[in-house]
Every structure is written in C-alpha cells, then in structure tokens.
Amino acid sequence: QSERRMKITRSILEVLAAHDHPVSIVTKSALVTRDLDLLAPMAAKGLATVGVSVTTLDAELATAMEPRAARPERRLETIKTLAAAGIPVTVMVAPVIPALTDHELEAILIRARQAGAVHASYILLRLPLELKDLFGEWLTTHRPDRKQRILNRLREMRGGELYESRFGARMRGRGNDAKLLEERFRMTCRQQ
C-alpha cells in the first residue's frame, strides 16, 4: 500500500531512466505495470528486465501462503502486460515447496511462457532459522494433514536438514528428489 501511495520505486526508476542505468525488478505485485511508461523505453535500450514470482496456480493456496500478494492469475496477467510492452520477463517459480506446490512446476512454466515470459528460474523453499518455526506453524494451521510429509520431503532434498546455507545447494537442494525437480524444470523449459 505504501508503494502505491508514495511511489518510491517509480521515483527510483525515473532517476535510473534519466541516466540510462540498467535495472532488474523482482516482484509478486501487479503494481509494476504502473511503471510501463518508464520500463518499456528502458527495455528497448536493453536496460530493464522484470522477474515475476509465481508460487502456485491455486488461488486458495496462494491466498493462504501470500495473503498480501497478487493472486496467481493476476501475476500471469502482469507477465503478459509486461511482455506485450517489450519488457523481458523471467518467471520465478519460487518457492517450490515439496509435497505442496512442486507438482505445479510444469504448469506454471507453461502458463508463464504462454503469457510471454522469456526466461525461467526456480528456488526450492529455504527455511533459515528464523523461518523454520514460522513455516511449521503455518503448516499446522493450513495443512496439518500434510505437515510431516512436506517437512520430510524438504529434509530429503536438503541433506537431512530443513535449511542448507552452502552456496549452490541452498537454492536448488541436493539428492535424488532435488535432481528430479531440476530435470523436470529443464525438460519443461526445453519444450517451450
């Protein structure tokens, strides 16, 4: 709400545009389309890209997980609007939550590509110490029947822990399930 009112990002973009300085924006918000008049000319010069994070296509789950963020369909509309304006868009499937959202990986990539995304990435759920308990509480409230399965799958993909800080593994995980997720991602991207 404060960005909508104060336009801080827009004022920064105005300065960057005036000086032909490159910018990459990562967002879950549809508000980024407000600044098309700045981003499109910058993109035409190769100076602007936008990454839009899509966690799930399930509107109900999205509301429970990210109550203040744009709904999945709105994010896909945002990708379409940005792409139509000539802005290179990356879809970021993030976070991928084993046994909760991982089955949607291909569908998200396909829908985002259809909307105009030209790049894609994914990030396996990361639970640093300060988030581990919070996520556990969220699961107890919203998915109590799946809590242990989700946490166990995450541990399998993180070498027995819920979080791994090691560079190269913290975003993707390790082990057979993590390799399978990466292969599914690569195969879907190749087919698009």
Label the predicted regions.
Residues 1-51, 55-63, 72-79, 84:
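Conserved Radical SAM active-site core
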Residues 4-7, 66-74, 100, 104, ...:
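Alpha-helix N-cap and loop-to-helix initiation/capping positions
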Residues 23, 48-52, 89-93, 120-122:
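Hydrophobic faces of well-ordered beta-strands that scaffold small-molecule active sites
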Residues 26-33, 97-106:
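Active-site glycine- and acidic-residue-rich loops that bind
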Residues 36, 62-64, 102-103, 132-134:
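Short, well-ordered secondary-structure micro-motifs
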Residues 57-59, 65-68, 81-101, 124-127, ...:
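Conserved strand-turn element in the central/C-terminal portion of the radical SAM core barrel
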Residues 103-192:
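Auxiliary Fe-S-binding modules of radical SAM enzymes
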